[in-house]
Structure formats: C-alpha cells, structure tokens
C-alpha cells in the first residue's frame, strides 16, 4: 500500500484560526499581485492550488521567537518583528496561498488574509484561560499544564504600547481524528504569547512548539456526517483506514504561529502557518496541500465567531458555565452522548461511512472515558447549542 495519502493530520495549531478572506471565504476568484486569478480554495482540489514561496527573511522573526521561547530574559524589540509584520500587511488582500521553506523533510503552509473582529475580541481567542477544545472542533481536549494562565492574561492584556511583551506556558493537547486515516494523537507543547506595537499597529502573536513526538495514533471516526466535528474515540492503537488498521503512526514535528495585526474598522490582518511531519517509522507522508486543507477547515470554523453576530461575552459565559458544572450534572449530560453513540452504532441509516464507525465502536471506551474528557464533551456541546448547531443533545 502506498503511504502517500494514508495520513492527513486532523489539526495543526491550537490557535491556528484564520484565513485568506478572498481565496477561502467563498469568492470564485481574486486578482493576485502578479495579475493572475487565484481560484477559491472552497471550489477546487487544494492540491491543485498555485503556491507561492514565502520569503525566508520574512519568517526570520519566527525563528528568533522559537529559539528564545522560554528565555524571557532575552530582550527582543518590536522592530525585530517588522519583516514578518510587513509581509502580512502587504499580502493581506492578495488572496495568495503560501508554502513554507522545507527543512529536513518537513513541509509547511501559510494563509494570509483579513478577518472581521475587533482587536479586543481577537484577544479572547489568544487567551490561555479559554480552553481551545471549547472553540475548535479540531481539538478533542486542551489543557494548560503550567497553571499560569491568569498571570499570562494579566501580563499580555495590560502590556504597555511600544513594548514587546512575551510569555509562555506548557500545554497538553489531544487532536480530533482525521476523517481519512482515522488517526488522533496526544502531545505536549510550549505555547508562546507575544504582544507589542510595530510601526504604530498593535500586534498579537501566538506560537505552538511541540516538545517531543506525539503518542502513537489511536483510532477515531466521525459518528455521522450530519454533525461535523462530532467523533467517537477508541483507545485502540492504529488507523481506522481500511487495510491499515495495524499501522501505528506518530506526529514527529509540529511548529505553528499565528499573528494578528490591527488595521481599522474592526478588521485585522491575519496569518496562520504551520510546519508538520507525521507518518510511520519516521517517513513523513504529509505535504503542503495536506496542511493547507486543515488550515482551511479551521478557518471556516472561525467564521462562525467573526462577523456572525455571536456575542463573545455570551461565549465566555457559556464556556465558564460548562467548566463549573457539578460532576453529577456532567455525568447526566454524558449519558446522553453515550446513548447517542450507541444508537448511531446500531443504525443502518448513517449518512457517513458506516463501516468505519461501527468497526471501532466499543461501549467499554465510553465507560472508561476519564472525567475531564467527559466534561470537555459537554462544554463543546454547550457551545454548539449557543451557535444553534446542537448534535448529541437533541432527540432524533
């Protein structure tokens, strides 16, 4: 069996949440800086897109931030971010799709564009006190391990203008399964936070640096295609992909960054980029277009928060309510999820690959699920209800 298309990783960045407003937000095409039309990524196969090479000099500030991620004594000035900030601003409206320099066999992709949120709202999505799994369906679970979230928020959100402020935390994450391979992974990472003013514009950045290779892949599957982002998680190692169930894969390398640059009229230029290597026995089977596919899905999800009329204060309250539910209430809600899973596993009318879900369904996995993962499921569903897209909590 060829390895090339076995794995397309389910998630790239914990805070990878942005987009190219032209090529990704539904326009048929846009005139690029080079005078050619870039077709919408929503209407063609992404592997056929025209990729432009991101200049190494523009990415140099990211190497510096990664190198000094945990060395807060190192003085990094706002001016040192200028090459990357200038690149993002100058390409925010071009609609171009970017590939990153390949290093040691690791490929990467980047999207640059403009989104509609106030800069204050953008801060919310960069907050280490907001569990990422409550916002992005590409994550099963996310936890800040260093217990410094509130301190980091106070430091970042009260930072004086003109001064580059940095901090970091240690995080643990479990990504959602990929719908092709059925693989999901767990890993620890260093999350970095950066805020400052560059050429008179407020800038906020986050980065994710994987500490070591991920856990071995475990099997997962979409429960029903009517409910994107709703998965069943097996504890069995391997892939759900038929014929490759025995294959135990890993994420070997992962690094990502996002940047928000304040523009005007409640708009900001945004770039999100990731390098990722994943595969079997050190063989990287991911390519640029695989990575960009995942960026696109995260981008589409962010649209439900930006310019949709969703009250972000209500979102915060909704998440806090779920995080503070009693254990008994969480258990009562979790039973609804279990009933939903069992019902779907016994149905012959699923609008999804029935074999994939039925093949891995095991009631014992539901019974043995740790409490913190049960709570995460409940919080995710409460957010869906707020967005008017409930799944397992409704009767069918």
Regions found by a protein language model. Give the residues of each.
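Bacterial N-terminal signal peptides that target proteins for export
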Residues: 1-8
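Bacterial N-terminal signal peptides
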Residues: 8-16
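Sec/Tat signal peptide C-region and signal peptidase I cleavage site
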Residues: 17-23
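Terminal "cap-and-tail" regions of soluble proteins that handle hydrophobic small molecules
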Residues: 24-396
């Amino acid at each position: 069996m060829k390895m090339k298309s076995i794995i397309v990783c389910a998630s790239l960045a914990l805070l990878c949440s942005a987009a190219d407003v032209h090529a990704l937000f539904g326009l048929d095409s846009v005139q690029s800086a080079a005078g050619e039309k870039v077709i919408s990524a929503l209407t063609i196969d992404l592997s056929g897109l025209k990729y432009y090479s991101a200049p190494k000099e523009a990415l140099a500030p990211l190497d510096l931030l990664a190198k000094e991620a945990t060395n807060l004594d190192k003085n990094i000035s706002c001016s040192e971010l200028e090459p990357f900030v200038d690149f993002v601003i100058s390409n925010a409206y071009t609609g171009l799709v970017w590939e990153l320099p390949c290093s040691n066999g690791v490929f990467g992709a980047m999207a640059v564009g403009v989104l509609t949120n106030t800069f204050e709202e953008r801060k919310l999505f960069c907050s280490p006190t907001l569990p990422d799994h409550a916002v992005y369906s590409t994550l099963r679970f996310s936890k800040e391990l260093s217990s410094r979230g509130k301190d980091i928020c106070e430091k970042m959100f009260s930072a004086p203008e003109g001064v580059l402020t940095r901090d970091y935390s240690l995080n643990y994450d479990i990504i959602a399964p990929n719908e092709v391979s059925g693989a999901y992974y767990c890993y620890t990472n260093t999350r970095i936070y950066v805020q400052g003013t560059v050429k008179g514009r407020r800038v906020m950045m986050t980065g994710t640096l994987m500490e070591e290779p991920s856990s071995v892949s475990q099997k997962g599957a979409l429960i029903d295609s009517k409910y994107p982002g709703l998965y069943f998680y097996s504890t069995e190692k391997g892939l759900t992909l038929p014929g490759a169930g025995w294959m135990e894969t890993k994420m070997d390398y992962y690094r990502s960054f996002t940047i928000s640059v304040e523009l005007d009229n409640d708009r900001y230029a945004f770039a999100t980029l990731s390098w990722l290597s994943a595969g079997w026995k050190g063989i990287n089977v991911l390519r640029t277009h695989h990575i960009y596919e995942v960026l696109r899905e995260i981008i589409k999800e962010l649209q439900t928060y930006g310019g949709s009329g969703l009250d972000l204060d209500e979102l915060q309250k909704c998440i806090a309510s779920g995080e503070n539910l009693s254990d008994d209430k969480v258990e009562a809600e979790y039973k609804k999820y279990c009933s939903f899973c069992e019902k779907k596993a016994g149905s012959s009318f699923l609008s999804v690959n029935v074999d994939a879900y039925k093949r891995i369904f095991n009631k014992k996995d539901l019974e043995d699920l740790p409490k913190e993962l049960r709570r995460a499921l409940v919080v995710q569903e409460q957010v869906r209800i707020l967005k008017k897209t409930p799944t397992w909590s409704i009767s069918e």
